[in-house]
Amino acid sequence: MDENFALTPDTQAVLLLCSAFGRKNGAFAPLTLPQYNVFAKALNGLGKRPADLLELDEQLIGEVCAQESSSPKVQMPEKERILGLLRRGMTLSTAVDKWSSYGVRVVSRADGRYPKRMRDYLMGKAPALLYYAGNAQLFEGGGMAFVGSRDLSAEAGEAIRKVVRGCVDLGMPIVSGGARGADQTAMQEAFACGGKVVGALTCDLLKACLEPSNRDALSNGGALLFSAFDPELRPFSYGAAAMERNKFIYAMADGCFVAQSGIGSKSGTWSGAVEELKRPSHHPVYVFLGNPASEGCVELLKKGALKWDMDKSVAENMASSSARKAEQLIEQDLFNGFSAAEPETPYERKGGTP
C-alpha cells in the first residue's frame, strides 16, 4: 500500500459528482456512468478538466450543462444538480478519511493512475471511479479469472483448485469476484499456494479489508481488492452491481475458466461469459466439461468457448487457445481486410480520460 497516496484534484471532483459516500439520502442523486460520460465529454469540449469544477464557477458549470448531450438516450445533468453535488466537500473529506483508515484508496478515470487495462478494455463503459486496497500493480498484471456457480459441485471445486495451482506455478495472478462458491474456492486455493489474487467486489469493500483471509495478503502485496461501487455498499443494496462486476473480472484477466454454469439470464456466470464471447476481440473463455451438473458449460462451448483439457497443463491449454485465436484473426483479416488502428478512447486527454 502506498502510504503517500493522495487524491488528485480531478478525482476529488469525480467523487463529488459520482459517489454517494455511503449515504442513501441526499438532495441530489450522484451521476450515473452514462450521465457522467455526457457531462465529462461536454466539459472536455470546453477545454476543461474535472478539477476545474472545484472552484464552483457557476458560469462554467452553466456552460457545460447547456451543451447538447452526446447521447440521445441520456439527458445532460442540470446545473443545480451539479452544483449541489460539488458542494459536498465536508462530507467527502469525512468519507475519504474513513476509507483511508481501512487502507482503501480511490482513482478516477480522469486520473493518470487509473488502470490502463480497465480503460482500454471497457473504454466509455469503464467505471468513473475505482476503490481499491492492496497491491495496485496487480491492476496491470493480467492472470486467469475463475467464475462459476455459488453452489459448486465437488467436481467443479476440485477442477478449480487444480487449475489454480497450475496458474500459481506459472506466476499468474488469480482473478475472481469474491462471491461464495467458485470465486472463494479459487481465492482460497491461491492464498494457500502463495499466489497473488485480484478480487473484483460488488459490495462491502471495507468489510473485506478486515477479513482474516485477506488481511495478510493485502499488507504483503499478495492481493488487490477493488470495486467500482461505494466501499460501504452492503449486500442487500447492490442490485445489478453483480452483473456489472462480470465486466471488470474479464477486463482484469487474460482468460477465464468457467467451472460451472446454468443457462439463461438468471445465471450471472452464463450472462457474463456470453457477453464476453460477443466481444469482437474477446479473451479466451474456457469451460470445464467434467461436471454433470453444469449444462451451461456445454452450451457455452457452442457459443465459442474453449474446452479446458484437465489432462493438459495450464501452459498447454493456453497455447492451444492462442493458436486457435491466431487462426481466427488470420481468417478475419483475409475476409475483412487488415487494420492495425487502435480503437479510439473517448475524451482522451493528458492525465487520463475524464
Which functions belong to the PLM regions below?
Residues 53, 60-75:
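N-terminal accessory alpha/beta regions
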Residues 80:
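Extended, charge-enriched "interface" segments that sit outside catalytic cores
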